[in-house]
């Protein structure tokens, strides 16, 4: 940790505090997610690190390394100076159709890359999409704590994610196709960009998860009259918001849809994207750490050392009261009626 110096706090996420730090040797800014040593270093954390390390795509935040402090495990990654896409939408209310398409195109290309590596994210949302600091912002997917690799793991069974973005089949307590669930979440993200609200939440009662689940299961959504979007866009949403995942649009179908292809930037077209799918490119190790070294550090982080003297605290792990709520396999009561 000695090679990094503190710049500022970035806030709390799923696992703990994130900080902006500077590499004292290269002057490069990085984001570091700090997680308490001990019981919090669980399967989700290990999975996030291993899945993240394997990724090399411009629409995915790049993993750099893990570091260990006396009290925390630090996950060092690329810093996205533009902040969350959610914050950008919140500041303007909603996007024009053209702007929403611009970000949706990048989101789909990033998710398509994940799926090509047999990784499903399972918690795609606008808060987990960051922007770089360029004038035409590049979208970057982050936070792989809930991700599952179909190569290393069985099909997902647990109910995880953020309620407003969850697909109907996730509530059925049986195995589901994580890739199809990601497609549904991308549709929710597109809707929020266009409308400035969640498609299946009651704006008068947004914390009523049972009502949200009812609307999700019934695919009960509408586009308000004040939102003027093209027929092609409406049709795309209707093909994504399909209760039966077998009938839902696939990423391949979305990428060939007329609305998606309109004004598609050259770097997102198939010839430019092809390089990221070449086996030798994905084997390039952008992190100086080998998997064995990473897992050794993660293993050490599961123990809390006896400290002979006080060390600097990173601050409270208490999350903000208004932070987004998450579901996991133990949050069963409110969706019992839909299993």
Swiss-Prot record:
GO terms for MF: ATP binding; protein serine kinase activity; protein serine/threonine kinase activity
Induction note: By salt and osmotic stress (at protein level).
Region named Disordered: 308-339
Stored SUPFAM superfamilies: Protein kinase-like (PK-like)
Top-rank EC class of the record's enzyme: transferase
Active site per database record: 123 (proton acceptor)
GO (cellular component) term, any one: vacuole
Pfam families tied to this protein: Pkinase (PF00069)
Domain Protein kinase: 4-260
Alphabetical UniProt keywords: ATP-binding, Kinase, Nucleotide-binding, Serine/threonine-protein kinase, Transferase
Regions of compositional bias (Acidic residues) in chain numbering: 320-339
Disulphide bridges: none
Annotated TM spans: none
Family: Belongs to the protein kinase superfamily. Ser/Thr protein kinase family.
Cited PANTHER family: SERINE/THREONINE KINASE, SERINE_THREONINE-PROTEIN KINASE SRK2J
Protein name, entry field: Serine/threonine-protein kinase SRK2J
Organism this protein belongs to: Arabidopsis thaliana (Mouse-ear cress)
Gene: SRK2J
